[in-house]
Amino acid sequence: MRGKKVWISLLFALALIFTMAFGSTSSAQAAGKSNGEKKYIVGFKQTMSTMSAAKKKDVISEKGGKVQKQFKYVDAASATLNEKAVKELKKDPSVAYVEEDHVAHAYAQSVPYGVSQIKAPALHSQGYTGSNVKVAVIDSGIDSSHPDLKVAGGASMVPSETNPFQDNNSHGTHVAGTVAALNNSIGVLGVAPSASLYAVKVLGADGSGQYSWIINGIEWAIANNMDVINMSLGGPSGSAALKAAVDKAVASGVVVVAAAGNEGTSGSSSTVGYPGKYPSVIAVGAVDSSNQRASFSSVGPELDVMAPGVSIQSTLPGNKYGAYNGTSMASPHVAGAAALILSKHPNWTNTQVRSSLENTTTKLGDSFYYGKGLINVQAAAQ
């Protein structure tokens, strides 16, 4: 590869990017009792700071209220009151306010449809979430400051961008979230939320990188004992060196997954890109939420399996979230599924993991367009 510049491009098409608002604080009133009592917070005026806690409690009790808790640092108390007590307390000269004891909710965590579509929650409910499995996201880096991601390590092979934990493109961060966004009550949930993410930067801010950078990234993954490699990238040109790298990774026991490509159809010709085209790599095509092949998804005899890749919600740099389209979004579903399987069967070889994924798919149609079908990680992990 010396002296030969071969650039490889990202395999995703951005049809939609939007920031998601997850949940909101509710002002819903706690359900009232049959006698009309509801929960309130009664606050006292600053001029009453010398009044004893006992006397403040009496102020509420004398109006028919039932004090639940008197706060230590806030001059107020929670109480159960009926409408009459509320009116009388609002008139009391010692009372500053009487407000509803509103109900707040944890910010909602969304489970992207793709996670459910491949049956990952069934493994989660059994306690298998990817623990002790290392996944290398060979991509544009990962924004390690994102609250929905926990990045265990990484390296950069891009000479001009030496920080793997800074994603100047957004692609790698989005891919990482699909693999392993945390189960932390915010944002989104990844396929394998407890997997260990490693940011291996091989693509620059413009979404491209030389094959030599990718090969360096694969070698780093081998040397650092990664269990799974995800490459949501590809190019139209084959390379003996790139093939040797992925073959070596598989020979070393790594499950290697790559996007099939976003080249759609071209008559009866294969449009699957490299490295997905190599036999040692699991090439992943994209379907939508109805299991229909995405029009952009590459086709060919090298296509192995399908996974969700249309309007996939995931993490973005800057503590954001958004939806992307592409086989780049499908591939990390399979990488995450491999991590789930390995968390349940830590002694399985990469060959067993791949076979289990391919032999338990939901058949969707002609293998030229759909490979072996949609992965079902619940069945694959049996």
From Swiss-Prot:
Residues 39-105 form the Inhibitor I9 domain. Used as a detergent protease. Sold under the name Alcalase by Novozymes. Optimum temperature is 48 degrees Celsius. Residues 112-381 form the Peptidase S8 domain. InterPro entries: Fervidolysin-like_N_prodom (IPR054399), Peptidase_S8/S53_dom (IPR000209), Peptidase_S8/S53_dom_sf (IPR036852), Peptidase_S8_Asp-AS (IPR023827), Peptidase_S8_His-AS (IPR022398), Peptidase_S8_Ser-AS (IPR023828), Peptidase_S8_subtilisin-like (IPR050131), Peptidase_S8_subtilisin-rel (IPR015500). The active site is at D139 (charge relay system), H171 (charge relay system), S328 (charge relay system). Optimum pH is 9.0. It is found in: Secreted. Transmembrane segments: none annotated. Monomer. This is Subtilisin BPN'. It comes from Bacillus amyloliquefaciens (Bacillus velezensis). The gene is apr.
